[in-house]
A protein has these predicted regions:
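Structural scaffold elements adjacent to functional motifs in cytosolic proteins
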Residues: 41-43
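Repetitive helical segments and hydrophobic/amphipathic motifs
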Residues: 11-12
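Rhodanese-like catalytic fold shared by cysteine-dependent sulfurtransferases
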Residues: 2-7, 17-28, 39, 48-82, ...
Length: 128
């Protein structure tokens, strides 16, 4: 039992550290950053989902990950936001980590994901 409790404590600590590494951004904050053209948004839901509907201006991570550095702004302090399906999806971390490893220091995630974005009445755009 003691080993199990130790395992849980370590696991929760790791999750807390990980969540702190890429802070959450609210839908309203992201919407404002988009309207002010102060954010690069990365969709991590896969190309098929991206084609069906994504946050306006978002990059398709599946298609762009090989040349992500060229897709991101020159300013390493610029806001970069990654998102996936919703609150239980952790796929966003691949893009967030990739941006972080490229030297970006203001990387956040939209934990609400595309489902929360749509549920809040925000618009999406489709890709050809």
């Amino acid at each position: 039992m003691k080993k199990f409790l130790t395992f849980l404590a370590v696991a929760f600590s790791a999750v807390s550290l990980y969540a702190g590494e890429f802070p959450d951004i609210s839908i309203n904050e992201l919407k404002q950053a988009i309207s002010e053209k102060k954010v690069t948004v990365i969709d991590v839901n896969g190309s098929d989902s991206y084609k069906e509907g994504h946050i306006p201006g978002a990059i398709d991570f599946a298609a762009a990950k090989a040349n992500l550095a060229q897709q991101l702004p020159a300013d390493k302090g610029a806001l970069v936001v990654a998102y996936c399906g919703g609150p239980t999806c952790g796929a966003y971390a691949a893009a967030a980590k990739a941006a972080h490893e490229l030297g970006y220091t203001n990387v956040k995630h939209l934990s609400a994901g595309i489902s929360g974005w749509k549920d809040s009445g925000q618009t999406t755009e489709k890709a050809n």
